[in-house]
């Protein structure tokens, strides 16, 4: 997946329609079609690495194809895929996805609205049971009996999707930058 070494604003829309696979040690796999993304890069005031490299954001500095997981509001985890060549801090936030199945740990109030089970970055991580322990993981297919997280499918520039580009949401700095993409009309896009 060398294409992940491109700038985050190119990778973010390309991830739409691809499938994020989460494999658990017991062999269970949950697939989530990516329907919404946001890009964050060096020089962007909303980027966690805007000021400097820290222990918290060091994964953003590469190499590309690794996971940058952080917690927001002290409650929810967010999943990002690191992009750009090593040394340049950048990542794509996976804001929302459509699950192929609802695991039994999904709360009952989400069972009647399956498209909404991962319709936001915190919900996505809850649905895939991704937390801070996954920070720094490499996106790669796991062998049977091992945990793993990887991508399947082709970048969206190779498919026919109705992609909408707009400004990012839920941030106070850099909110005017149009680095949010989503699949138009998809029921799993976050409502933020």
From Swiss-Prot:
<keyword id="KW-0378">Hydrolase</keyword>
<dbReference type="InterPro" id="IPR036995">
    <property type="entry name" value="MPG_sf"/>
</dbReference>
<dbReference type="InterPro" id="IPR003180">
    <property type="entry name" value="MPG"/>
</dbReference>
<protein>
    <recommendedName>
        <fullName>Putative 3-methyladenine DNA glycosylase</fullName>
        <ecNumber>3.2.2.-</ecNumber>
    </recommendedName>
</protein>
<comment type="similarity">
    <text>Belongs to the DNA glycosylase MPG family.</text>
</comment>
<dbReference type="Pfam" id="PF02245">
    <property type="entry name" value="Pur_DNA_glyco"/>
</dbReference>
<dbReference type="GO" id="GO:0003677">
    <property type="term" value="F:DNA binding"/>
</dbReference>
<keyword id="KW-0227">DNA damage</keyword>
<dbReference type="GO" id="GO:0003905">
    <property type="term" value="F:alkylbase DNA N-glycosylase activity"/>
</dbReference>
<dbReference type="GO" id="GO:0006284">
    <property type="term" value="P:base-excision repair"/>
</dbReference>
<dbReference type="InterPro" id="IPR011034">
    <property type="entry name" value="Formyl_transferase-like_C_sf"/>
</dbReference>
<keyword id="KW-0234">DNA repair</keyword>
């Amino acid at each position: 997946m060398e294409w992940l070494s491109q700038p985050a604003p190119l990778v973010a829309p390309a991830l739409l329609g691809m499938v994020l696979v989460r494999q658990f040690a017991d062999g269970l796999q949950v697939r989530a079609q990516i329907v919404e993304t946001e890009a964050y890069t060096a020089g962007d005031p909303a980027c966690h690495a805007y000021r400097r490299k820290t222990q918290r954001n060091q994964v953003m500095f590469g190499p590309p194809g690794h996971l940058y997981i952080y917690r927001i509001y002290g409650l929810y985890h967010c999943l990002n895929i690191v992009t750009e060549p090593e040394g340049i801090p950048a990542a794509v936030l996976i804001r929302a996805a459509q699950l192929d199945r609802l695991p039994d740990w999904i709360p009952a109030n989400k069972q009647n609205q399956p498209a909404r089970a991962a319709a936001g970055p915190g919900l996505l991580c809850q649905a895939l049971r991704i937390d801070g322990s996954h920070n720094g993981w490499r996106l790669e297919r796991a062998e049977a009996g091992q945990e793993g997280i990887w991508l399947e499918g082709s970048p969206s520039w190779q498919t026919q999707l109705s992609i909408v580009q707009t400004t990012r949401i839920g941030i106070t700095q850099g909110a005017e930058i149009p680095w949010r993409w989503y699949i138009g009309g998809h029921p799993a896009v976050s409502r933020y």
